[in-house]
């Protein structure tokens, strides 16, 4: 927002800020531009066509754990001199592809931005992989032995001073944890939880390896991992931000905002497979309010970090019906309806994503995973009418096992003001940040959409999912859609162009990214490409307008849900911090894994139309476009 790195924020064009929004917390109070500290994209992706590695015959078909051995042997073959560890978040997706993630180590410490992901097919062979391992010289362990580096408190103070964090560290002290060179800080004020520090290595922009402290500070509007040089205690090498800006009377699923329909009363809307405890239980406690296994929704007028004791409506009869009118004012007068709408939209999206493969083992957001894999205790904290800002929204995605946090704001660009919780596309956009961050790089690593281009694609995936869900029964490929039109009170929405298959209406192509340096603008290009994929698949397979897909052998039978499924499967295949070309290849690979490549022509044609054809080349400053479709594909 305003040029600051607020990953997951919805964002607006500059013109929307003619009347600046009030900001009360976090980085919005400062002038430090965190974009300067974004991590660089280091990974390469070897797609399924390029991967011709045979797994040992004894592993085909693989047993429940043998895919880890296949992946490990592959890493040893590609990087024979590297030391590494297996990240404990591997799983087999519902398309039959296993995902295993590795972290490179040096002298017993993690190289925090050196990752390797291996995707193993159902036949027990390596399907594709991504690699950002460091290949340069590993430094001597002498610095560690002699402890020739700054102490963690110095690192915390250096981080706070350089980034101008609104926290007080004068009385900070550090306590060691059970992990090697890992500390938690006490005596710090202004943070949601005690800051942490861990000694790691970090691959710098110039390709060299630096010893660094990874300092974690959650200050509500920003949840930061700061890599500060362990010797100087001042130079910052990179920053990751986890924040990416019964009977229910609601706008039903598929109604994007109040201009598209009326509120209705919906009874027991949960999916009993995706939400086996319903939406208002966590398996041990049954609630009579907007709290359950998938989310907890409440009012947050102060904009603070506390939520458990915040106000939420309660009904002993489980009748969550509260008045709302678009002409009502102030927004606090309809807070009950706002909380229930937010709770409904987030929960029903959870259930849809579960059906499409975002399950417990894939790192979804649930308090109780009920023995289905993954880590629990991480429902989504859903703050309605959050007082920490206006005219926006954001989502914080920490690693699996820690709650996601969505902040929905009031929009002040109309009279009366409008509440973002009543525009489903905004809620879906924010929740999708949690989806894309958990799937890319694995559930245990939330650092994999932090480069400029990958962060842009994060915004694009969020817009795409919101738009796909918004489609109406009578829509055709000539139908255009905007983002945030109702909440912002802007006829053209909050993006540069509407999403359209017309190059006249929306002329964005791959090379448009060369002139862009903001994630939301880059995301509009990516989502425009995915909108082309969506309609090519709908033209081939038809469109299911029901709130859930029909699956045949795990494959959606229609084009809309198939496109959403392939996009999600591609997230799990692609490397950490991918670029457009790699993400395109991952979607093509997802189709190969799911359908045997039945839709390669439609996918290639869609990407080629907007310049991401077979000859497209990535460069951070001079991307080369291509409208070429590979021969023999169509």
UniProtKB/Swiss-Prot annotation:
Could you list this entry's UniProt keywords, alphabetically sorted. Allergen, Calcium, Disulfide bond, Glycoprotein, Hydrolase, Metal-binding, Metalloprotease, Protease, Secreted, Signal, Virulence, Zinc, Zymogen
InterPro entries per record: FTP_domain, Fungal_virulence_M36, Peptidase_M36, Peptidase_M4/M1_CTD_sf
GO terms for CC?
extracellular region
The set of disulfide-linked cysteines is 448-576, 601-634
Primary localisation category = secreted
Signal peptide coordinates: 1-18
Per the record, what is the consequence of mutating residue 470 to K?
Normal secretion level
Gene Ontology MF annotations: metalloendopeptidase activity; zinc ion binding
Q: What is this protein called?
A: Extracellular metalloproteinase mep
Species, as recorded? Aspergillus fumigatus (strain ATCC MYA-4609 / CBS 101355 / FGSC A1100 / Af293) (Neosartorya fumigata)
């Amino acid at each position: 927002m305003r040029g600051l790195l607020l990953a997951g924020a919805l964002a607006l064009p500059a013109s929307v800020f003619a009347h600046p929004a009030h900001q009360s917390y976090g980085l919005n109070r400062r002038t430090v531009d965190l974009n300067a500290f974004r991590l660089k994209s280091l990974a390469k992706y070897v797609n399924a066509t390029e991967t011709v590695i045979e797994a040992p015959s004894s592993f085909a078909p693989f047993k429940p754990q043998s895919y880890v051995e296949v992946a490990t042997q592959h890493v040893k073959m590609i990087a024979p001199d590297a030391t590494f560890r297996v990240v404990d978040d591997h799983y087999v997706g519902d398309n039959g592809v296993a995902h295993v993630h590795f972290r490179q180590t040096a002298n017993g410490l993690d190289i925090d931005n050196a990752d390797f992901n291996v995707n193993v097919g159902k036949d027990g062979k390596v399907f594709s992989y991504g690699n950002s391992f460091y290949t340069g010289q590993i430094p001597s362990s002498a610095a560690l032995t002699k402890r020739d580096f700054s102490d963690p408190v110095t690192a915390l103070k250096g981080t706070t001073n350089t980034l101008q964090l609104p926290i007080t560290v004068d009385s900070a002290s550090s306590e060691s944890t059970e992990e090697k060179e890992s500390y938690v800080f006490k005596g710090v004020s202004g943070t949601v939880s005690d800051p942490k520090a861990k000694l790691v290595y970090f691959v710098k922009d110039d390709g060299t390896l630096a010893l660094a402290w990874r300092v974690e500070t959650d200050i509500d509007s920003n949840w930061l991992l700061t890599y500060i040089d362990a010797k100087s205690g001042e130079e910052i090498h990179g920053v990751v931000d986890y924040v990416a800006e019964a009977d229910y009377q609601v706008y039903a699923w598929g109604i994007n905002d109040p201009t598209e329909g009326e509120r209705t009363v919906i009874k027991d809307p949960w999916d009993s497979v995706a939400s086996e405890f319903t939406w208002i239980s966590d398996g041990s406690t049954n609630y009579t309010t907007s709290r359950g296994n998938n989310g907890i929704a409440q009012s947050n007028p102060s904009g603070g970090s506390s939520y458990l004791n915040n106000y939420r409506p309660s009904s002993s009869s489980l009748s969550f019906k509260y008045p709302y009118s678009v002409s009502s004012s102030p927004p606090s007068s309809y807070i009950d309806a706002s909380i229930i709408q937010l709770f409904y939209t987030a929960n029903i999206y959870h259930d849809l994503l579960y059906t499409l493969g975002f399950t417990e083992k894939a790192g979804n957001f649930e308090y109780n995973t009920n023995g289905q894999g993954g880590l629990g205790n991480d429902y989504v904290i859903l703050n309605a009418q959050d007082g920490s800002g206006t005219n926006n929204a954001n989502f914080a995605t920490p690693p699996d096992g820690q709650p996601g946090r969505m902040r929905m704001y009031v929009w002040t660009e109309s009279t009366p003001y409008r509440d973002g919780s009543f525009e489903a596309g905004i809620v879906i956009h924010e929740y999708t940040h949690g989806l894309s961050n958990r799937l890319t790089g694995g559930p245990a690593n939330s650092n994999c959409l932090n480069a400029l281009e990958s962060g842009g694609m994060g915004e694009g995936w969020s817009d795409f999912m919101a738009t796909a869900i918004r489609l109406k029964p009578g829509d055709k490929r000539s139908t255009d859609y905007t983002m945030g039109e109702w909440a912002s009170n802007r006829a053209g929405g909050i993006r540069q162009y509407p999403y359209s298959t017309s190059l006249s209406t929306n002329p964005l192509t791959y090379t448009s990214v060369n002139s862009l340096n903001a994630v939301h603008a880059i995301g509009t290009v990516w989502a425009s490409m995915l909108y082309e994929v969506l309609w090519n698949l709908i033209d081939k397979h038809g469109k299911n307008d029901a709130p859930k897909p029909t699956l045949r052998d795990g494959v959606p039978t229609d084009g809309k849900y198939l496109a959403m499924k392939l996009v999600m499967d591609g997230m799990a295949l692609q490397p950490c911090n991918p670029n457009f070309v790699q993400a395109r290849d991952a979607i093509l690979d997802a189709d190969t894994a799911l359908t045997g490549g039945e839709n390669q022509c439609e996918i290639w044609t869609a990407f080629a139309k907007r310049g991401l054809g077979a000859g497209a080349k990535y460069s951070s400053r001079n991307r080369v476009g291509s409208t070429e479709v590979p021969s023999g594909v169509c």
